């Protein structure tokens, strides 16, 4: 079963959208296997966004992610990386389709509510960066037979 890393950013936490976002993933039939509310250290933020460290917005992004708690999560399900990206919507909320998380709640590129891994390999890297192995739970959801053939 595929896994992905999802983070509700400080703006999503401050706007009290945690339940709404978690609910969307649950209603889609995905399984939450790890979750924690945390204030991100600068070191972790820089590691997480290291692919963007040459961009002019890098320091502002790191400062923003460290400014208030985030909700870090690991979700599991068939094709979850690609499906969750569709659920999240375009990076720029103004370009995100209505019905997506960013389309419904995002305000600007810098305040776009949520992060989701963009590829399976990225998800593996991000999960290992944010969670210890023992923090990710293995459990059988009783609804699996109703979702998967």
Swiss-Prot record:
Keyword Ubl conjugation belongs to the record: no
Ligand binding (ATP): 9, 57, 85, 91, 102, 112
Catalytic activity reported: a 2'-deoxyribonucleoside 5'-diphosphate + ATP = a 2'-deoxyribonucleoside 5'-triphosphate + ADP; a ribonucleoside 5'-diphosphate + ATP = a ribonucleoside 5'-triphosphate + ADP
Keywords of the record: ATP-binding, Cytoplasm, Kinase, Magnesium, Metal-binding, Nucleotide metabolism, Nucleotide-binding, Phosphoprotein, Transferase
Main localisation: cytoplasm
A molecular function (GO) term: ATP binding
Pfam families from the UniProt entry: NDK
Cofactors, names only: Mg(2+)
Gene Ontology cellular component list: cytoplasm
Enzyme Commission code: 2.7.4.6
A biological-process GO annotation: CTP biosynthetic process
PROSITE patterns: NDPK, NDPK_LIKE
Active site: 115 (pros-phosphohistidine intermediate)
Location relative to the cell: Cytoplasm
Function, in words: Major role in the synthesis of nucleoside triphosphates other than ATP. The ATP gamma phosphate is transferred to the NDP beta phosphate via a ping-pong mechanism, using a phosphorylated active-site intermediate.
Assembly behavior: Homotetramer.
Family named by the database record: Belongs to the NDK family.
NCBIfam families per record: PRK00668.1 (NF001908)
Protein name: Nucleoside diphosphate kinase
Organism: Synechocystis sp. (strain ATCC 27184 / PCC 6803 / Kazusa)
Taxonomy of the source species: Bacteria, Bacillati, Cyanobacteriota, Cyanophyceae, Synechococcales
Record gene name: ndk
